From Swiss-Prot:
Keyword Aminoacyl-tRNA synthetase: yes
Any one GO cellular component localisation term in the record: cytosol
Region (Disordered): 122-149
Ranges spanned by the short sequence motif 'KMSKS' region, renumbered to the chain: 248-252
Main enzyme class: ligase
Entry-linked PROSITE patterns: AA_TRNA_LIGASE_I
Name this protein carries in UniProt: Glutamate--tRNA ligase
HAMAP family documented for this protein: Glu_tRNA_synth_type1
Binding site for ATP: 251
Protein task: Catalyzes the attachment of glutamate to tRNA(Glu) in a two-step reaction: glutamate is first activated by ATP to form Glu-AMP and then transferred to the acceptor end of tRNA(Glu).
SUPFAM superfamilies given in the database record: An anticodon-binding domain of class I aminoacyl-tRNA synthetases (SSF48163), Nucleotidylyl transferase (SSF52374)
Length: 480
């Protein structure tokens, strides 16, 4: 039998990896880390990365889940050279290989009823034997191929499957532990373990990076590959990700979908940096650009131990990237959050200026968008705590005075606005806070913002003056 290449298998490419999610849900952080490791290994070796959608579970696979996976991969910027390929579109190919295997005696039809199989299992369990098929139908000539049947792979009965896992080292499993795997169901559809084998063969996959939950599938898949005369890829099984409580990561630990992190205001660079460190490291280094990851990543450096997810560490990394990446780049991601929060940014400062103003204060872009709403939209109310603290009757005079000085300004910049506040404080013999804090609440609606000169320039002159007058009227109305 021969492989049927889906694309040009360049002989110069020595490493070809794949990410093969099942579209039964969103792209979760465990899957994203597997994709990242697979992608990095291919890039490190100037190889190719293939995306394959394993949608053989027809009942649970959905187009929405496929779209969510593709969206997550695109957001993380994990680009693929080939794909996405869908297993459901390759059933003819799988069945062609199965038919050839039957002809060559590598597989056989099994006509056993559910009742017979249940009786067999019960008998084996009573005799304290490992449940396995007894090859009752091997060499069966009594039944017609038209009768309902499954197809089983004729697994070797002697010897062992031995493979060198790139992460875990030598793994050996006795063939006596393995059953004659069903490779085609009664309805004619090929099974997961078989489709994976044919795909890896046809796609020339050299390295399979996947979760440790697949270790039990590997010896079965290796035996099928050997039967086909196909090359055996190198396997690397990475450990699971745990929550900070030591339990398997799940929804109760917070966001587990990649796109949920986007929605919560994280940058893809932060999530990638965090995920690569969940099981891999290079000395004590914490911050890795994608270029550094590609240069340094090796599967042999991946830990065998499970890693615990720490949201605080991810938040720290996110704040680092908000501060350190170019403001123009961060602003492109920030724009999505304004749109998501229904904030019209057409009338206000440039988004990259918002990033420069708030990068030190805000740890997420979601927080940054919410904290800068007042630059683009007027507000109907003031923060209650800020009103109680700063909107006393004594605030009316400095607000009126600073409004007068700001109104008279010919140029609206950092120097002139700061001077107006400073002069107001000096003339009224007040500390800067007695002028600046009521002014801050007046123009932002809250007691927190960047420095007042930066804030005023961002809001603009016309809006600033209207808001100060609104605050003066509000204080007077509260103290009638």
């Amino acid at each position: 039998m021969k492989a049927e290449a889906l694309f040009d298998l360049d002989p110069g490419v020595k490493v070809r990896t794949r990410f093969a999610p099942s579209p039964t849900g969103y792209l979760h952080v465990g899957g994203a880390r597997t994709a990242l490791y697979s992608w990095l290994y291919a890039k490190h070796h100037q190889g190719e990365f293939v995306l394959r959608i394993e949608d053989t579970d027809l009942e649970r696979s959905t187009p929405e889940a496929t779209a969510a996976i593709l969206e997550g991969m695109a957001w993380l910027n994990l680009a693929w050279e080939h794909g996405p390929y869908f297993q459901t579109k390759r059933f003819d190919r799988y069945n062609q290989v199965i038919d050839q295997m039957i002809e060559q005696g590598l597989a056989y039809r099994c006509y056993c009823s559910k009742e017979r199989l249940e009786d067999l299992r019960n008998t084996q369990e009573q005799n304290k034997q490992k449940p396995r098929y007894d090859r009752h139908c091997l060499g069966d000539h009594k039944h017609s191929p038209e009768q309902p049947h499954v197809v089983r792979f004729k697994n070797p009965t002697e010897g062992s499957v031995v493979f060198e896992d790139a992460v875990r080292g030598r793994i050996e499993i006795s063939n006596a532990e393995l059953d004659d795997l069903i490779i085609r169901r009664t309805d004619g559809s090929p099974t997961y373990n078989f489709c994976v084998v044919v795909d890896d063969w046809d796609m020339g996959i050299t390295h399979v990076v996947r979760g440790e939950d697949h270790i039990n599938n590997t010896p079965r898949q290796i035996n099928i590959l050997k039967a086909l005369g196909a090359p055996i890829p190198t396997y690397a099984h990475v450990s699971m990700i745990l929550g900070d409580d030591g339990q398997k990561l799940s929804k109760r630990h917070g966001a587990v979908s990649v796109m949920q992190y986007r929605d919560d205001g994280y940058l893809p660079e932060a999530l990638l940096n965090y995920l690569v460190r969940l099981g891999w490291g290079h000395g004590d280094q914490e911050i890795f650009s994608v270029e550094e990851m590609i240069k340094l990543f090796e599967l042999e450096s991946v830990s065998k131990s499970a890693s615990a997810f720490n949201t605080e560490k991810l938040l720290w990394l996110n704040h680092h990237y908000i501060r350190e990446l170019p403001a123009e780049y961060v602003a492109k991601h920030l724009a999505w959050h304004y749109q998501d929060q229904g904030i019209d940014t057409s009338n206000g400062p440039a988004l990259e200026d918002i990033v420069k103003m708030l990068a030190e204060r805000c740890k997420t872009l979601k927080e940054m968008a919410a904290a800068s709403r007042y630059f683009f939209e007027d507000f109907d109310s003031f923060d209650e705590a800020a009103v109680k603290k700063h909107f006393k009757v004594a605030a009316i005079e400095p607000l009126e005075k600073v409004k007068e000085k700001l109104t008279a300004l010919d140029s609206w910049d950092l120097h002139s606005t700061h001077q107006a506040i400073e002069q107001t404080a000096a003339e009224l013999e007040l500390g800067m806070g007695k002028v600046g804090m009521p002014l801050r609440v007046a123009v932002t609606g809250s007691g927190q913002s960047p420095s007042m000169d930066v804030t005023l320039v961002g809001i603009g002159k016309a809006r600033t003056l209207v808001r100060i007058q609104k605050a003066i009227d509000f204080i007077k109305s509260q103290n009638v």
